[in-house]
UniProtKB/Swiss-Prot annotation:
Protein role: Calcium sensor of the mitochondrial calcium uniporter (MCU) channel, which senses calcium level via its EF-hand domains. MICU1 and MICU2 (or MICU3) form a disulfide-linked heterodimer that stimulates and inhibits MCU activity, depending on the concentration of calcium. At low calcium levels, MICU1 occludes the pore of the MCU channel, preventing mitochondrial calcium uptake.
Protein's recorded name: Calcium uptake protein 1, mitochondrial
Chain intervals for the UniProt region annotation (K/R-ring): 128-131, 261-265
Range of the transit peptide: 1-33
Domain of life: Eukaryota
Residues noted as binding Ca(2+) 1 in the record, renumbered to the chain: 233, 235, 237, 239, 244
Claim: Ion transport is one of the keywords in the record: yes
GO MF term set: calcium channel inhibitor activity; calcium channel regulator activity; calcium ion binding; calcium ion sensor activity; identical protein binding; protein heterodimerization activity
Keywords, in A-Z order: Calcium, Calcium transport, Disulfide bond, Ion transport, Membrane, Metal-binding, Methylation, Mitochondrion, Mitochondrion inner membrane, Phosphoprotein, Repeat, Transit peptide, Transport
Length: 477
């Protein structure tokens, strides 16, 4: 309505203009008529704009705007609660944040946030990864503060597409104040007594030094540790003391992507302390720190750590009667695959189609398969022998390889799930190359990838090319 009034006013102005130019009235009269027409059109336009703004302002808000306002209010409130400012200490008996029992379907915003977090996992420094995914800041008795991860935070920091809880991000933490009497009571909230995380620091929490150490242990093959131990075992008794183990740890860490990217940052407090944390040194070398660590005991520690991380990963899927669905197991296998999203979706749909009413998988079945994956290099060799001999890589062959190489039994149901994922043409035979490459990435949990976007390597290649070209010009053949 308002727009029609404005258009009619402009039309009258145009008619007046044509009349002005088409008549022979005196010049003064024409000017007065033109001025009146212009002022009238301006007044109509201005009043129309004011009325339109008033009508729009008085209209009731939409449902979406209500939700947005409520979300903004909740966000500002929660942000104030979890702010990392030193003066806003929380209650001493505050509970750890509750995990969502059921995962809602990811919306556009959630997908973009998860893509951003995946880039942090892949390309950021260990300092930033730790500060982003850690959720607790602990204030001790002297008033000093230190940031910690829970075991769940640690698993989330190395698992793609696991979204950080709302209002907890970079330098945003739940603040807790501990005293000596509360430590024993709080410990079981973060780690079970039988878990390897229970031995870490206070209450089973993970400091920055622990985080670097654990990622190093997870991303290093067992064989590398065996060689490093033998290099520093000068007397050949298979044991190393604390100083020798620190050297082993330093060398191994320098070969990992986390170690290569780490730089001590005193401003954030994330620096690698000399030696391990006191709890781990006691665990490895005894209370007096004069004990010896054997390669057997350390590899047992590595095995327990892998078991506990896998257990936490299994429990994140909220098992029903101790079982997770076949699709959830497939998601665990493909979590670090790097497969394109379209192909990944197609593989998951294929899995859902095969197991609409599946019975699920127990933790023991999942653990047996991951024990099989620990020997993936030997598995690759064995499968290659079968392939060269002309034998088909069917389920019976996979079970035979598992018994021979890893000394574990793979259930028929686990093999059915694996073949549903990697049997591309549906002929009942495994796609060997794709299966082995994806399983190698799964075993390393993506920690073996270089933590850069290739720009540095590109510059180095260009510099090397320029040097060689300049040398060719200087010394022509």
């Amino acid at each position: 309505m308002f727009r029609l009034n404005a258009l009619s006013a402009l039309a009258e102005l145009a008619v007046g203009s044509r009349w002005y130019h088409g008549t022979s009235q005196p010049t003064q009269t024409k000017r007065r008529l033109m001025l009146v027409a212009f002022l009238g059109a301006s007044a109509v336009t201005a009043s129309t704009g004011l009325l339109w703004k008033k009508a729009h302002a008085e209209s009731p808000p939409s449902v979406n705007s209500k939700k947005t306002d409520a979300g903004d209010k909740g966000k500002s409130k929660d942000t104030r609660e979890v702010s990392s400012h030193e003066g806003s200490a929380a209650d001493t008996a505050a509970e750890p944040y509750p995990e969502e029992k059921k995962k809602k379907r990811s919306g556009f915003r959630d997908r973009k946030v998860m893509e951003y977090e995946n880039r942090i996992r892949a390309y950021s420094t260990p300092d930033k990864i730790f500060r982003y995914f850690a959720t607790l800041k602990v204030i001790n008795e002297p008033g000093e503060t230190e940031v910690f991860m829970t075991p769940q935070d640690f698993v989330r920091s190395i698992t793609p597409n696991e979204k950080q809880p709302e209002h907890l991000g970079l330098d945003q933490y739940i603040i807790k104040r501990f005293d000596g009497k509360k430590i024993a009571q709080e410990r079981e909230k973060f780690a079970d007594e039988g878990s390897i995380f229970y031995t870490l620091g206070e209450c089973g929490l993970i400091s920055f030094s622990d985080y670097i150490f654990l990622t190093t242990v997870l991303s290093t093959p067992q064989r590398n540790f065996e060689i490093a131990f033998k290099m520093f075992d000068l007397n050949g008794d298979g044991e190393v003391d604390m100083e020798e183990f620190e050297q082993v740890q330093s060398i191994i860490r320098s070969q990992t992507s986390m170690g290569m990217r780490h730089r001590d940052r005193p401003t954030t407090g994330n620096t690698l302390k000399s030696g391990l944390c006191s709890a781990l040194t006691t665990y490895f070398f005894g209370a007096d720190l004069k004990g010896k660590l054997t390669i057997k005991n350390f590899l047992e520690f590595q095995r327990k750590l892998q078991h506990d991380v896998l257990k936490l990963e299994f429990e994140r899927h909220d098992p029903v009667d101790g079982r997770i669905s076949e699709r959830q197991f497939g998601g665990m296998l493909l979590a670090y695959s790097g497969v394109q999203s379209k192909k990944l979706t197609a593989m998951q749909r294929q899995l859902k189609k095969h197991f609409k009413d599946g019975k699920g998988l127990t933790f023991q079945e999942v653990e047996n398969f991951f024990t099989f994956l620990k020997n993936i290099n030997d598995v690759d060799t064995a499968l290659s022998f079968y392939h060269m001999a002309g034998a088909s890589l069917d389920k019976v062959t996979m079970q035979q390889v598992a018994r021979t190489v890893a000394k574990v039994e793979l259930s028929d149901h686990v093999c059915d799930v694996v073949f549903a994922l990697f049997d591309c043409d549906g002929n009942g035979e495994l796609s060997n190359k794709e299966f082995v490459s994806i399983m190698k990435q799964r075993l390393m949990r993506g920690l073996e990838k270089p933590k850069d976007m290739g720009f540095t390597r590109l510059m180095q290649a260009m510099w090397k090319c320029a040097q060689e070209t300049a040398w060719d010009f200087a010394l022509p053949k």
